[in-house]
Amino acid sequence: MDEILKIDTIDRYNKLFGFETRHPLVGVVRFDTAESQGNYRMTMGFYSVFLKETRGCRINYGKTGYDFDDQTVVSIAPGQTVGYTDIEGIPTKSVGLLFHPDFIRGTSLGRKIRKYTFFSYEANEALHLSEEERTIVLDCLKKIEMELRHAIDKHSKGLIATNIELLLDYCMRFYERQFVTREDLNLDALARFERLLDDYLSEGVAAREGLPSVRYFADKICLSPNYFGDLVKKETG
């Protein structure tokens, strides 16, 4: 698995795993029907959102690897390198949404895609769903899949883009819930940040190096810059 595959199109991704391509720029894939589930490392040229329903594979991206629990959502931005490794003896049951940046260009979703900062979270910052949340995510995916099976007409793109946007809005809501339910961990991270900031200022580093970046502190407490920034905004208002 040393070679990194460059997967620029959804059609090429589908061919790798044996999925049917219903639309060149959007796809909903179900890994329990995949013809191939080997071990891969790849850089994808499109957005992807995966709902893991079993612990049947390991996913590595960013700086960390993670054996995802059931009912976990992983969101990956274009250009990230992702590794898939099957876990022997455990069947993979997961469903994924793939959509190319070209598809959302000129849409409401295209104009707001950057607000979905969870696309740049680390693997261990994935979204863990309740049963009710899982049902909502699956319902959104089913609606997108239904549109992909429908004959293309003048409404197709708008309906698909709207349902993708709805799914991402739900993910944002669920992440905000996760920040609340993990408050103890979040407060610990913020306390470490405050100590690091005090040290940075008291030891004269600021005078030499200038004001630190979000990435500087995020790296120190082992969080992605986007997750750390969202955490600070959530806790401080």
Model regions and ranges:
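A structure-centric signal for secondary-structure junctions around beta-strands
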Residues: 25, 46, 91-93, 161, ...
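Short beta-strand His + acidic residue motifs that chelate non-heme Fe in jelly-roll/DSBH
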Residues: 58-60, 82-89
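Basic/polar phosphate-binding segments, predominantly the helix-turn-helix DNA-binding elements
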Residues: 211-237
